């Protein structure tokens, strides 16, 4: 699936990146001591950011300006792990995020209950890479294009706390930030291997000189997979180059290329998931189900500081995707999906930091625009190859426009009041070119005005209290609107999903303990739920009223120091998520629980670190209570507890070694599940979790 025009782009990008690098690599700067245990050296040392790329410290400072729960996840959280391939691996200890693997690098992602009934791919969370949209223009998306090896940090902006990115979704946004030649100078060579035929390698290089810098990474991965029919291969290029064309101005250009081949084992029944977890769904085997993707992303951001206290930013991105996707819509009804998509996006944002009557004041104003086109064809599928018999042909389009304004005023010393609003409109359209089974053409548009109010109190040194009341509107995606089930026709007439969320919480660091705790209560109208109506078939519907509420709590505590030698320490890192999602006096389902996510999710790691660079410790994942998979609350998953072990050694010469053993007891469990209106014991809704596995890796930075 390596097409000629993409091959030329790939070669040109590689040549451009190579031409930016001198023969001599720079040596990475020494690590800056942290407030807790000494950090690993698998990531670049903290270096000052630039106008287009704030440093990790600057990003953390921005997070502290937000009157809601925002987490900055440093790359060390996942780069010191061998075999970290998915969004789950990147956000494992981020409370409030439910991300569980399905197959390959795909995951089931939900933040505060977003998209819990989206059985395929993603809705309800906006994904950004370097501030530019990864989602398609209609808001849908997936995770295959995200390479954990190429990120410097992940910014987790839950719910309306992604306001300044223009994300009007219940789940908020995830912003994946790549390094630059200034933040990651030098060369990285990395290799990993492990269970189920897993092997991965990476070479990356960063360079900076004068007003110019460049960084690029190439990685390749192959795996056979834990389950039958779950093998995959992926090759990825990511890079950027920056030019400080004035003391107060900078432009950065980004490029990314992905070539991914992935088999899909499919969901199975509960009994099969717990008794024969490695087996694939028989229909997926017969259809030779796969998801093969080739994509190219180009983008640019320019930032100008015309005077102190004013920052003006503008950017644009383009993504081209080619998807070849053999699937099983029903036993004996096998389809081959052939899609070609093109999405463009643009944004403008201005930030004004000024004093009003001697009080600090910040105003942010911005606009976002996105437009996408998808040519979608379907054919009968013969063992993973398209036949000449067409079953669907459409041109689908999506457009979004929105603007936002937010102001934060320090009304009292250490106490700020925040007020803002966003307004926008979305358009969706599908032109059906295959009319022998009826005309499914249609179009719709949805508009919104959403206010937001918040408070932020610096209660003590290193401790903040925050709260906000925010509204959001989430238009349906094209996937929601276009018939996905075999016997369903017509462009759906869905309302936009609306919610109002009240959130309170606290965060901070005092001495050897850091924490983040938040509680939220959301009331939703017209929640969009994709209900399974048959084998691998989904129909999107609006619910009437529903409630999402929960608690997000995380900490990082160094509770012992100088145990056996000066400079060593023992730390404990727990993350707890409580999710209470339910119908609100529904005519059919009363006050039943909404299916799809566990009520309680607890993860923790204990780690001993020696000043020589050696570290090790146990890990645990605990879901103490099974959760429902259907609206009728008749069928459940199963509770489980998993134990693991991690270890590593960071040597002074730039070499790092790391090892991870997962699911040591080889527990059989259900990692995630699709949802249905009413399930039976024979419903194929369950994704088995991975059995016992071991991964190891080496990284050398010079």
Where would I find each of the regions flagged by the language model?
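Structural signature of Gram-negative outer-membrane beta-barrels, strongest in the C-terminal barrel
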Residues: 354, 359-371, 394-523, 607, ...
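Short acidic/polar hinge/loop motifs at secondary-structure boundaries
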Residues: 132-158
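Membrane-embedded beta-barrel scaffold of Gram-negative outer-membrane proteins
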Residues: 303-305, 311-327, 458, 464-470, ...
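C-terminal beta-signal and adjacent terminal beta-strands/loops
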Residues: 473, 570, 622-627, 649-702
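N-terminal periplasmic accessory domains that precede
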Residues: 60-63, 87-90, 109-110, 125-129, ...
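Gram-negative outer-membrane beta-barrel transporters
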Residues: 350, 412, 416-417, 425-426, ...
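Transmembrane beta-barrel wall of Gram-negative outer-membrane proteins
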Residues: 186, 193-222, 227-265, 290-307, ...
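Face-selective signature of the C-terminal outer-membrane beta-barrel domain
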Residues: 248-258, 292-435, 456-458, 516
């Amino acid at each position: 699936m390596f097409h000629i025009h993409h091959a030329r782009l790939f070669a040109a990008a590689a040549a451009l990146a190579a031409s930016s690098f001198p023969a001599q690599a720079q040596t990475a700067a020494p690590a800056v001591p942290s407030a807790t245990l000494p950090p690993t050296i698998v990531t670049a040392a903290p270096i000052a950011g630039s106008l287009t790329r704030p440093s990790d410290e600057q990003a953390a400072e921005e997070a502290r300006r937000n009157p809601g729960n925002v987490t900055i996840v440093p790359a060390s959280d996942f780069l010191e792990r061998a075999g970290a391939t998915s969004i789950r691996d990147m956000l494992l200890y981020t409370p409030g995020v439910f991300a569980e693997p399905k197959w390959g690098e795909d995951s089931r992602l939900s933040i505060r209950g977003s998209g819990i009934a989206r059985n395929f791919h993603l809705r309800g969370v906006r994904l950004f890479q370097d501030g530019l949209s990864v989602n398609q223009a209609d808001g849908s998306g997936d995770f295959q294009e995200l390479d954990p090896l190429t990120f410097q940090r992940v910014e987790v902006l839950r719910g309306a706390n992604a306001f300044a990115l223009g994300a009007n979704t219940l789940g908020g946004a995830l912003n994946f930030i790549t390094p630059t030649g200034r933040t990651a100078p030098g060369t990285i060579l990395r290799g990993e291997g492990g269970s189920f035929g897993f092997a991965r390698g990476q070479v990356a290089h960063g360079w900076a000189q004068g007003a110019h810098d460049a960084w690029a990474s190439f990685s390749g991965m192959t795996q056979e997979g834990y389950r039958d029919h779950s093998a995959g291969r992926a090759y990825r290029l990511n890079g950027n180059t920056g030019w400080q064309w004035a003391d107060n101005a900078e432009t950065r250009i980004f490029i990314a290329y992905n070539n991914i081949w992935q088999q899909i084992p499919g969901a199975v029944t509960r009994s099969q998931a717990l008794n024969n977890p490695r087996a694939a769904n028989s229909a997926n085997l017969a259809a030779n189900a796969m998801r093969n993707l080739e994509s190219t992303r180009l983008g640019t951001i320019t930032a100008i500081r015309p005077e102190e206290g004013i920052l003006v930013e503008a950017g644009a991105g383009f993504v081209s995707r080619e998807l070849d996707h053999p699937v099983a819509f029903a036993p004996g009804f096998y389809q081959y999906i052939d899609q070609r998509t093109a999405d463009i996006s643009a944004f403008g944002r201005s930030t004004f930091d000024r004093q009003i009557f001697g009080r600090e004041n910040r105003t942010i104003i911005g606009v976002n625009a996105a437009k996408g086109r998808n040519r979608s064809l379907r054919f009968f599928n013969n063992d993973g190859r398209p036949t000449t018999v067409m079953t669907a042909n459409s041109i689908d389009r999506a457009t979004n426009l929105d603007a936002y304004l937010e102001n934060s005023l320090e009304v009292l010393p250490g106490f700020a009041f925040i007020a803002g609003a966003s307004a926008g409109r979305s358009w969706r359209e599908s032109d059906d070119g295959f009319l022998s089974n009826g005309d499914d053409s249609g179009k719709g548009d949805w508009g919104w005005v959403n206010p937001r109010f918040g408070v932020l109190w610096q209660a003590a040194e290193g401790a903040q209290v925050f709260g906000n009341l925010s509204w959001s509107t989430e238009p349906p995606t094209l996937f929601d609107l276009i018939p996905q089930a075999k016997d369903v026709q017509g462009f759906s007439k869905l309302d936009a999903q609306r919610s109002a969320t009240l959130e309170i919480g606290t965060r901070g660091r005092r001495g050897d303990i850091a924490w983040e705790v938040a509680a939220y209560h959301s009331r939703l109208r017209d929640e969009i739920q994709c209900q399974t109506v048959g084998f691998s078939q989904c129909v999107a519907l609006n619910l009437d009223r529903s409630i999402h509420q929960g608690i997000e709590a995380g900490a990082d505590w160094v509770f012992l120091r100088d145990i056996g030698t000066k400079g060593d320490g023992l730390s404990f890192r727990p993350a707890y998520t409580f999710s209470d999602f339910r119908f609100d006096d529904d005519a059919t389902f009363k006050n039943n629980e909404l299916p799809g996510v566990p009520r309680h999710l607890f993860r923790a790691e204990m780690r001993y670190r020696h000043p020589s660079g050696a570290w090790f410790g146990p890990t645990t994942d605990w879901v103490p209570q099974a959760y429902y998979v259907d609206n009728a609350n008749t069928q459940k998953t199963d509770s489980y507890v998993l134990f693991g072990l991690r270890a590593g050694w960071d040597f002074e010469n730039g070499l790092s070694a790391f090892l991870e053993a997962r699911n040591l007891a080889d527990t059989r469990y259900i990692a995630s599940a699709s949802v249905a209106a009413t399930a039976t014991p024979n419903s194929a809704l369950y994704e088995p979790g991975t059995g016992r596995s071991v991964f190891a890796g080496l990284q050398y930075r010079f």
